[in-house]
From Swiss-Prot:
Locations listed in the record: Cytoplasm
Catalytically driven reaction(s): (R)-4'-phosphopantetheine + ATP + H(+) = 3'-dephospho-CoA + diphosphate
Lineage: Bacteria, Pseudomonadati, Pseudomonadota, Gammaproteobacteria, Enterobacterales
Molecular functions (GO terms): ATP binding; pantetheine-phosphate adenylyltransferase activity
Domain of life from the UniProt record: Bacteria
Record-linked Pfam families: CTP_transf_like
UniProt-recorded name of the protein: Phosphopantetheine adenylyltransferase
Length: 165
């Protein structure tokens, strides 16, 4: 039986930090579903359709990415629907770990077969976050080291299209 893992996130936008986790996970799991959250309480710069498209662009070269999907609702319920019992989570800091441990416990209560596997960020990308990258882009800083080329161009264009206050 193939091991299907889900890597959830907002991916606004997908960064080299995310790709580090995804690439390493492809060496362990047969199939990976990248699940992009459509959390209405989180303010995103890219809409869900754009985030799915950009994530597909950034991961097209990875053969065992089963699909890139958007989702609403509980992650544990998505895992059940997709017949997956593994969540992949990236951890950069002790603060991330503290949050992720609590989330894993809640997901386990909802779906007892669901396990969370934590990937420590590689040191080269451990400081990258989508929020930091967007902040740098907003003020026309150099974001090339943090994003694949296609994502870099999309983010620059997005900030040009948004009127600055």
């Amino acid at each position: 039986m193939k091991k299907i893992a889900i890597y959830p996130g907002t991916f606004d936008p997908i960064t080299y930090g995310h790709l580090d986790v995804i690439t390493r996970a492809t060496k362990i799991f047969d199939n990976i579903i990248i699940a992009i959250s459509n959390n209405v309480h989180k303010k995103t710069i890219f809409n869900l359709k754009e985030r799915i498209k950009l994530t597909k662009l950034a991961t097209f070269h990875l053969k065992n990415i089963k699909k890139v999907i958007g989702f609403n609702g509980l992650l544990a319920n998505l895992a059940k629907r997709e017949k997956s019992n593994i969540l992949i989570r990236g951890v950069r800091t002790i603060f991330d770990f503290d949050y992720e441990i609590k989330l894993a416990a809640i997901n386990k209560q909802i779906y007892p077969d669901l396990d969370s596997i934590f990937f420590l960020s590689s040191k080269e990308v451990s400081f990258i976050s989508s929020s930091f990258v967007k902040e740098i882009a907003k003020y026309q800083g150099n974001i090339k080291p943090y994003l694949p080329k296609e994502i870099h161009f999309a983010l620059i264009k997005k900030f040009k299209d948004i009127p600055q206050k």
